Every structure is written in structure tokens, then in C-alpha cells.
A protein has these predicted regions:
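Conserved catalytic region of serine esterases and O-acyltransferases that act on ester linkages
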Residues: 30-67, 71, 77-85, 177-242, ...
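Active-site segments of SGNH/GDSL-like serine hydrolases
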Residues: 64-67, 348-354, 376-413, 429
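Membrane/wall-proximal cationic-aromatic binding patches
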Residues: 78-144, 212-214, 218-222
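Alpha-helical scaffolding within the catalytic cores
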Residues: 118-131, 327-339, 368-376, 439
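Catalytic His-Asp segment of secreted/periplasmic serine-dependent ester chemistry enzymes
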Residues: 332, 393-490
Length: 490
């Protein structure tokens, strides 16, 4: 009985202990849940308010790139046109320059603008040479200078093919003795050995008084060689050529040998001179190997070529990271000697990728630096037309993380146009020909892709596209020149 009472007491005690919790538990959980919802709401409100506040913080950059601005309403916000920033040094942007003579231009085509001076230094010389291509005792030559935009024969390879299909010709033209991109260039097989190579882009000492037209020089050891072989898989007209020339400078005698298509070596004994020299082999040349058999002193070698006897040839002179100002360091004597041995009919200057920026809007300094360089080229090559090609589209991300044309690009183009006008040469607006603002994004998104994801450089497909645009405007310019000339003779 006692045991029963004890159990009953414990049971009753348990009821007493449990009863308050049982009675008040629903009220406790309700208050707890209400507080939890309130705290969650307040925390969310605080986070959203913080994100809205962060939108009004100043722009922040990391390693030169603007970090994306926080904007919760970016998907529904009506976008406004943002005016290009002006820097404090900008005075007056050069006005658009009207060409001296305005030909009609096809709808949809961006034509070459002529700013010929009193000596007629526009495109006249080049168009005249093309008109006499079959009667000249040499090929019509184009020197195409540029930066990494044309590296490895991008653009120039396709332009060369188009011109050679229309006017004849073969071969890739001028090839420096050695190169760091031999495996990347698909228009020629290039091998070499036994050379001490020097380039304007070297971080160590470079003697600018010894350089050639491509901003290189090469010092051979005995037995040094360079081989070129035509390529038929990538483009036409470059699998064989008719003339291969070796360019060098030596004050003492030396002996060279050239082997064509793996055949017997043809020897050359060369005397010393204080000027540029060249020796050539002829024939149907699919491959050629030049070798230094003996040298009595330190000679400088520059390039070997694969050229036609007639027709057109395009020499690619690309320098990575260049703004074009390195051309001003080439000795005038060397330029004049190249004009004597390798006469050019058109000199193209395509730079700007390494000049345009977000921060700079006034490019007077660049225009003024390039003016004497253009004048030097006109003096050294008095019978060559000069064409300045404006910088192409270049995209980067703004503070909202959206791709846009770099603000400095369009400004720089205006200064490049002014450079052409002030030096009396021709100008082609590649930016507009590509499609203007956003065209680089379209080339990247194109199927197949025509540009790289840096939104700065084109690939070989993009090069073919732009080469086609330039080729068509060159042909149209030639047609208009011939019509104008015929009209003036009536």
C-alpha cells in the first residue's frame, strides 16, 4: 500500500511539474516564432538597405580594372547614355577633317580618306603601280607596319592572298632571320640556327643604329642558317615563289650558300661594303635554305624573302606592344637603302592598341610624336603612298560590369585622322569599317568566333574579315582614281 501511495505521489508530482509547461507551451512557442520572423525581417531589411547604400559608394578599381558597382535594380533600370569622360588636360578635340577631294563612296563601305599634299602623297602612287603591275620589272610591294593586331600574319596574310589573286604574285615576302612566333605563323615554315638575335623589344641592350626596317638585327656564327618553306594548307599563292633574297650588311668579305628545294647549294662570295647588300636565287622555289659558309668579321643579317618577279607582295612588320614610335629610331640611311633595294609602293601604319586607354582623352602628344615619323618615311620612300589605318574597336568593362567600347578609342581615331591630314597622307577608319561601337563584342560572339576574349585582338577568321573590307575599299579607291584621272584628261 505504501508502495502504491509512493507511486501515486510521484505520478501526482509529475503531473504538477508537467502541467505548467503543458498549459503554457503553445503561448511560449508562438512568441518565439513571432520574434524569429521579426528578427529575420529586420535582418533582411538591413541587408537590402546596405546593398542599396553600396550603390552610391565611389567606384573602386583593382589592378586597373573597375569592380562592378552593386545595383539591385540593374535588370529593370532604364539605361542612360553615359557621356565620355573629359580629363582636365583636354582642350578642344580636333574637328573631323574634310578630305581635299571627296569621291563618291558606296553605301555601307568605309572609304579611304585622301589628304594628299601638294606633292600628291595620298594613294596615287599605289594605284598607279597597280595599274602598271604587268609591265613593272619588279613586284608591287606593300610594307604593312603594326602591333600585335597583325602578329603572325593575321589580316596581312589574307590581304596578300586577295591582292595576289587579283594582280598576280606569290610568296610571303620579307621574313626576319629569326622569330619567337615561328610556330604560330601559319603562312610559312620557318627554321633557323646559329644566330644571336636582337630586337627592339629586347629587355637587354639593343643598338638602334644597327637595326633594319623591321627593328631587328642578327649576328651569325659560322654555319648559321635560315630556312623557309612555302605553305599550301592555309592560303593560296604562298606554297611556292620565284625569287628568294637575303639582306645583310658586312664591311668585310663573306661566303653564303643557298639551296633551293633541297638541291645543290649555290655559292655566293660577297665583298665588304658600308651599305645594305642583297643576293638572290631564282626559280620555282618551294623551299630555300640560306647558310653562312664563312665570315671574316662580324656581319649583320636582316631577312630572307619569298617573292614573285611580278604581281603583288605584302611584307608583315608587326611589333608586339608597339605604338609605332619605334620606327623613328631606324637610321635614315638604312631606310633609304631599303628604298633602293626593296622599293615600296604603299606603306601602311596601323597602330593604337597600345595607345588608347580609359584615362587619356587628349592624344595630342601621340599625334605630335608620330608626325616626324610619317615625314621620315615619306622622305625615305619618296614614291610610296602612305596609309594610316585607325585603331579598331577595343572593349572593356565599365563599373557596372558591362562591356563597352573603351572611351579613348574614338578619341584616338580623331587624332589619327588629324595626323593623316597634317602630314598629307591617306586615312582609313577601321573602327567604323568593323561596325563601330560594340563591333568587337559581335566578332567575339560570332559563330565561328572571329576575335579573342580579351575583346582587343582578332583571330585569323577576324583577320580575313577585316582584310576583305580593306581590300574592297582599296579596289574601289583605285577604280575612283582611274575614273577621276580619265575625267581630268578629257
Amino acid at each position: 500500500m505504501r508502495f502504491v501511495n509512493t507511486c501515486a505521489q510521484k505520478q501526482a508530482f509529475g503531473l504538477v511539474l508537467l502541467s505548467p509547461f503543458t498549459i503554457f507551451a503553445p503561448d511560449f512557442r508562438g512568441k518565439f516564432m513571432k520574434n524569429k520572423l521579426l528578427y529575420t525581417f529586420l535582418f533582411t531589411l538591413l541587408v537590402v538597405a546596405g546593398l542599396f547604400a553600396m550603390h552610391f559608394l565611389p567606384s573602386v578599381s583593382f589592378r586597373g580594372e573597375p569592380l562592378r558597382r552593386v545595383d539591385l535594380l540593374s535588370d529593370i533600370r532604364i539605361k542612360k547614355e553615359i557621356a565620355e569622360p573629359m580629363d582636365s588636360d583636354t582642350l578642344v578635340l580636333p574637328p573631323p577633317v574634310k578630305p581635299a577631294f571627296v569621291d563618291t563612296c558606296k553605301s555601307g563601305m568605309v572609304c579611304i580618306e585622301e589628304y594628299a599634299d601638294s606633292a600628291g602623297r595620298g594613294m596615287e602612287y599605289f594605284y598607279e603601280a597597280l595599274g602598271k603591275v604587268s609591265s613593272l620589272d619588279r613586284p608591287v610591294r606593300i610594307a604593312y607596319f603594326g602591333d600585335s593586331f597583325i602578329e603572325a600574319d593575321i589580316l596581312t596574310g589574307d590581304l596578300r592572298e586577295m591582292l595576289q589573286k587579283r594582280f598576280g604574285g606569290c610568296g610571303v615576302g620579307y621574313v626576319p632571320i629569326t622569330t619567337k612566333i615561328a610556330g604560330f605563323r601559319p603562312t610559312v615554315h620557318h627554321s633557323f640556327g646559329g644566330w644571336s638575335s636582337h630586337s627592339i623589344t629586347d629587355s637587354t641592350y639593343f643598338d638602334r643604329f644597327r637595326q633594319d626596317i623591321s627593328n631587328h638585327y642578327f649576328i651569325p656564327s659560322s654555319g648559321a642558317y635560315v630556312s623557309l618553306k612555302g605553305e599550301k594548307r592555309f592560303l593560296s599563292h604562298i606554297d611556292t615563289c620565284e625569287v628568294s633574297t637575303c639582306y645583310f650588311l658586312t664591311s668585310d668579305s663573306l661566303r653564303l650558300a643557298a639551296s633551293v628545294n633541297g638541291g645543290e647549294a649555290q655559292p655566293f662570295s660577297v665583298g665588304g661594303k658600308e651599305e645594305l647588300q642583297s643576293v638572290s636565287v631564282n626559280g620555282r622555289i618551294g623551299s630555300v635554305r640560306w647558310k653562312v659558309e664563312q665570315l671574316d668579321s662580324t656581319a649583320l643579317f636582316y631577312a630572307v624573302t619569298m617573292d614573285p618577279r611580278q604581281g603583288v607582295v605584302v611584307d608583315n612588320f608587326s611589333t608586339r606592344g608597339s605604338s609605332g614610335q619605334q620606327l623613328g629610331n631606324i637610321p635614315m640611311s638604312i631606310l633609304r637603302q631599303y628604298n633602293r633595294l626593296r622599293t615600296y609602293d604603299l606603306i601602311v601604319l596601323q597602330y593604337g592598341l597600345n595607345v588608347a586607354s580609359d584615362e587619356v582623352m587628349n592624344y595630342t602628344y601621340y599625334k605630335d610624336a608620330m608626325k616626324p615619323i610619317v615625314e621620315r618615311l615619306k622622305t625615305a620612300f619618296p614614291e610610296a603612298s602612305v596609309l594610316i589605318v585607325g585603331v579598331g574597336d577595343r572593349e572593356n568593362k565599365d563599373e557596372n560590369g558591362e562591356l563597352r567600347t573603351m572611351p579613348g578609342v574614338k578619341r584616338l581615331i580623331r587624332y589619327q585622322q588629324a595626323l593623316a591630314a597634317e602630314t598629307g597622307v591617306a586615312f582609313w577608319n577601321m573602327f567604323e569599317a568593323m561596325g563601330g561601337e560594340g563591333s568587337m563584342v559581335e566578332m567575339v560572339n560570332h559563330k565561328p568566333q572571329m576575335a579573342n576574349y580579351d575583346y582587343t585582338h582578332i583571330n585569323f577568321r577576324g583577320g580575313k574579315h577585316i582584310a576583305g573590307l580593306l581590300f574592297e575599299t582599296l579596289m574601289y579607291g583605285k577604280e575612283q582614281y582611274e575614273k577621276r584621272k580619265a575625267y581630268e584628261m578629257e
